[in-house]
Amino acid sequence: MINNSLTELFYAQMQLIRRTEQTFFALYGRGLMAGTVHTSIGQEACAVGVVNALDRTRDVIFSNHRAHGHFLAYCDDVEGLVAELLGRRSGVVGGIGGTQHLHKDNFYTNGVQGGIVPNAVGAALAEKHKQSGAIVVVFLGDGTMGQGVVYESMNVAALWSLPLLFVLEDNQYAQSTHRCDEHAGSLAQRAQPFGIESAETEADDVFTVYAAAQRAVAYVRRQNRPFFLVLHTYRLAPHSKGDDTRSAEELQRYWARDPLARLAAVLPDAQRAAIDAAIEQRIEKAVEKALTDEVEEIGDWRLEIGAHQSLHPPIPQSPNLLISNLQSPISYLESLRQSLHTILEEDSTALVLGEDILDPYGGAFKVTKGLSTRFPDRVRTTPICEATIVGMSVGMALRGLHPIAEIMFGDFVALAADQIVNHAAKYPAMYNGQVAVPLVIRTPMGGGRGYGPTHSQSLERLFLGIPHLKIVAASHLHDAGALLRQVVADREPVIFVEHKLLYPLALVRGEGRRARRETERLRDWRLGVEDWAPVRGDGVLQMAEGVDRFGYPVALARNYGDDETPDVTVIAYGGMSRLLAPLLIEMAAEEIRMLACLPTCISPLDAAPLVWAAAQSGRVLVAEESPAAFGWGAEVATQVHALAGDRLYAPVARLGAAPTVIPAAKPLEDMVLPSQAMLAAQVVKLLEM
């Protein structure tokens, strides 16, 4: 028997979705909207039927590019949605996200097909970890079922028994391509090999959808396991605004099955007219208000990472646990390992996940050894699924956890590029500062161990300059473990680069060395005599440490005294420190005074300490392990020339790997990668200019 109150409610919600989206088409026609719009006209029963089966006070939704219906059914914020698509400040995310990128409370969308699915898996893991009782729903379309990350996500959701409801809206088309030209077999059976229960139903009747959703939601909540619900529906409007290639006969056939018209037919005319009038008035007022609203300003925090207080951690009193305070020599590897233990001890929201990280193996490079024994519930080994490892971590971070994801080899970050670039780095600014993504991706980079072309690269270069993403690299002239603790405290996503050849090296120590606590700008960034300290056990090297304006340490090392100036400055980062430390000693023997500058936050880049270091000598070499062309060194050289060009005696020199694959054979690898001898030759060449 039909419930009259539900009939009225469902009709009002479906009509609100329909008329709002039709209004968007009208606004486009008037030239008041730009870009694109993806409507769900004809699919309203899916959104309304599923959302009304949820607990809006706690359940979480991840949706896709076609999310207006889900948003209105869940958030009931037509005013915020209209303003968003009109690009106004009062939009749900200030006009930044537009039609595809919406967020309010527990509702998230993104426009990349399939990308939201591992985010939803991570959110489900977070809710399970917090014991909130919430379930997570992820809406996806039939076209998205071609994405591999969807199946990675299903596997993990089933493996870890997560409270996640997959809702597949099968509208038969992926933009313009029909399902029969894209998928073999049954979509409804795709979840079964993972042991995920599934059901399917026609979605031309909202009560049928509602009943199916109620059963699915009850199962997920009761069993704490995923469920796969397939809703067979049809999109009656174009993919976007006017790109419909379907035949008139086909459209007419499905208009005759319109779920909204079917529901409207059972309501009394007067009741339906009253609902329609109220909806029209609400939409008209929303449009009128939005058109008089201002456009959001692009503030400094969106243009430059670290300038917005709510998205950046406070600079600690001692930004790096100073090496001079270490009680005994410690290796780069042990420093990282100890810090991971400390992080999990002190932060109950911190979780570590990655491939082969459990004891007794403890990870490919043994950084996680001992962690799973002490923290069995917060250290999770994963399948081989880099995109989902990072994607899950994004979802966990959005829901209040502090995930630390390990990618076994840095070369494999390419498999997670979409999650890093289009999800982790996008959400905070795309959602107008309403969320943070405190995610750390630890990964070993670099060559020198004979692992060959696909396990030896320095692919952090691929992510340099990505807005709202930090790349931090520790050398053995820094306390790597303390730096790891600092990036975990950061509220923005960080790729933490660990060089493989540094793991066994002892951290280089300076006696009495102290940190500078200011965040100084270009013309003020300098070090005084009192900041330098000799390296223990070495009569040549001295070290100092500064802090860039993002709060991250910058190590400096020199081979000359207080009353001298350097002949040359070498700027590098990360694993290059293993070459620079002995190079300083070699240059001292040749009576060449050298200053080495190694920042840790290599992107975004604070040029001030690098410019200061360059100006000390007027001759600068920038070195990196990846090929020099289009690399980090190019940006450093540009900044140095622009800001200190009048103090240079020669153009900035650059050194990087040869522009080819990194061979496995040791003699060939040595020919390709930068070496101490290559650095020395470049220094001598600079001094001859």
Where would I find each of the regions flagged by the language model?
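Conserved acidic/glycine
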Residues: 1-46, 231-232, 236-322, 329-375, ...
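Glycine/charged-rich beta-loop-alpha catalytic/anionic-binding loops adjacent to active sites
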Residues: 27-33, 96-110, 133-138, 172, ...
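General beta-strand structural signal in soluble alpha/beta enzymes
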Residues: 39, 61-64, 94-95, 121, ...
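Thiamine diphosphate
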Residues: 104-285, 358-440, 448-450, ...
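Internal gly/pro-rich beta-alpha loop/helix module
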Residues: 449-497, 506-522
